[in-house]
């Protein structure tokens, strides 16, 4: 496969590009990763055993659980800050997580506000403070503003901070204004755990419409409609046809993407990070094969010479791609069947089921998996390089963390 990136349209808020020369499993893996697998700095407030937020005082109309949920939805732009430690942070799939956690443990979000006025007070991210536990002081507010930046409309200079909670004013001398006092540690996570941790507000793709074929089909339809419709009715029906039926006429293996970040990462960076995460996951799968962790067993469900390759903690993102590459590489000369399925969404594993023309050993199956993984890594390296040509190839080196990750992955 030779992926091609074309039709790049990069604006201040949105990135559009065309990915062609690849199967839909590649495009879908890229989209799934951008939507759910890109890690970022977060406020973890659920489940209760992992909650990092603490409320000392809350007299607002919202109880603590609602405020915790609202807190977890606030994006944290630590990558935009000038804190020196965060310059080199690359929150990868496996690497650097321990380093990131150690840095995040230094900081504590604090909020302490009381409404002493006679009108409702809006408590926003502008009121947030960040305490450096090692230095025993608060980081400067201009730095906090970079981490929790306001929204500035294109046509105005007004700054709009994210509203967290409203504090009602005091009613009498005996009934004071509402107060909120809380703190929270920083953590890291991805939208796979909770949708509030997503780094994109738009991430979609569709088949590239074959404009010439679609126009020819429309002219045929207009000619057909002319016998029973007026000119105005034909024009209206043509517009209606373009909304749906036109999109069914598309170029094979060509997809138009639209990506819109919530602001933590640049739009192009989101695409390249998705490529890097997929490459890391493929390397990790390859490492599991070399470490003899990959489980291969005889399949009881179909013909002889059939085997099930069990992928732990990998879903359609990796499994469908791997199945596709194995299929086009080895069918029908070596294999007579190659399929993929995750039996239930809650399962921690999925299955690639293969059937061979002749009996084979596990080592042969592993080598075929490794060959397919190498081909997929090359595809995503090329996609990444097409978006940022000046960057060197993304390098992944196994670390001591990988063994710990494998131990976690390959447990029932």
Spell out what each predicted region is:
Residues 1-412:
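Protein-protein interaction/assembly regions in multi-subunit complexes
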